[in-house]
Amino acid sequence: LAVKSIREICGQYKIESLMTFGGEPLIYPEVVCAIHKMATEMGIKKRELITNGYFSRKKERIKEVVKSLEESGVESLLLSVDAFHQETIPIDPVKYFAKCVSNSKIHIELGPAWLVSKEDDNPYNLRTKEVLKEFEDLKIPIGAGNVIFPSGNALKYLGEYFDEELSYSSPYDEDPYDIRAISFSPDGSILNGNIHSKKILDILEEYQP
């Protein structure tokens, strides 16, 4: 359905970029590759993937998936590595994945999540800097990453690190009256509809904030 939706959207709109992310998208690498293959065929120039890089411990499987990503047309990859991901994700298979990607035609950057700000001197940011050092020998550039916004679980479990006197605004909120990007949820939900029950073009045309 995702592949079909991309084809239909590109038939009606000029799409400049496509990104697959999660959850962890590479748990389903065949789906990710099918999506990027269609994006390539439809002339979408910017094709990105965000992943934590952990979907297998087997080196042959990791190499196989990277080759498939390259062949499907993935242009750039943002690898999420930081204190939060590495609490539960082993670093060795992720580092091997990063090495394989850096040896391919796919541009790769490390994308850490910072707590409060990159400059803030808290234990999570210090740990993130330690994690990033693990990748220094691969000479992979470090991107801007993202800053954790104080809402939901972040506010519940990390609230002590945020200044109660400050007013925070999410950098990820979009104006519902000026939609520049759309995002598909794993269950097919998008905007006010679902592609399992309605055609994507109908959802877009009937959208109301």
What are these regions (language model features)?
Residues V131-E134, E206-Y207:
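Residues that form generic nucleotide/phosphate-binding pockets
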Residues G143-P209:
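Accessory C-terminal segments flanking Radical SAM cores
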Residues E24:
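Substrate/cofactor-recognition hotspot
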Residues T20-F21, T51, G143, P150:
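Short glycine/serine/threonine-biased micro-segments
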